[in-house]
Amino acid sequence: MLFRSVYGAIEIFFILLLIPVLTMKSMADEKHQKTDQLLYTSPISINKVVLGKYLALVTLFAIGLLIVSLYPIILQNLVRSVAEEGSTSYTVNYAVAYGSTLGFFLMGCAYIAIGVFVSSLTESQVIAAVAIGVINIFTMLMTSLANMLPSSKIFMVCFFAALIVLLAFALNFWIHNKWVSALVGLVAEIVLFVLYFFFSSHFDGLLYNVLSAISFTDRYTNFTYGILDVSAMLYYVSVSFLFVFFTIQRIKKQRYN
């Protein structure tokens, strides 16, 4: 319990403060300093530039986490000395300690990938930091927020219909083609209502189920009990890969424009 409480505080510090600070300059500063043009004309490919920035940030994160990983050893030595004085003994569960560290590292890599992508969308470091912080807070609290919303089928279908509209606008912002965006949105709305018509019973509490499935922190819970959740590990790696890919495509699009 002591270790989990300490790691909970470390998790909040890393995710809500350290990662936004680390990633806010990664791409936004290039635009602000107008050095992004050098990236576009560099003999090094955009893929390598983005991947290099991402891996550099992951390395910094890993160094910080490496220091934190000394805590279980220090704690064990501390409680051993206390036990020798006649107090109740306490043994650090290293499986829990380092399982949590591994899970937290992979989760942090995913958060860093998202942060780098958000940084590529703006030239303001402040806006990037705030946006990354808000996104990170949302991912930590989204299942709790979902519990506060109605779980009725009607609300669920209306919510996802509105979400599709927002995603269509986001797609238009990305590809600058309103007809393709409108078509994709229309097809998605049709699919949604067809699914609702035939499988309406599955829409009860659907939002909570979806958010639980994609929640970073919910998937991290197993690691805090010493369980190496392979599906969670693959999920974090997939999210990292996906957002690094999004960042590369974003930079390439700016280059061609």
Show the residue positions of the predicted features.
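Hydrophobic alpha-helical transmembrane segments of multi-pass membrane transport/permease proteins
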Residues: 1, 10-19, 136-137, 242
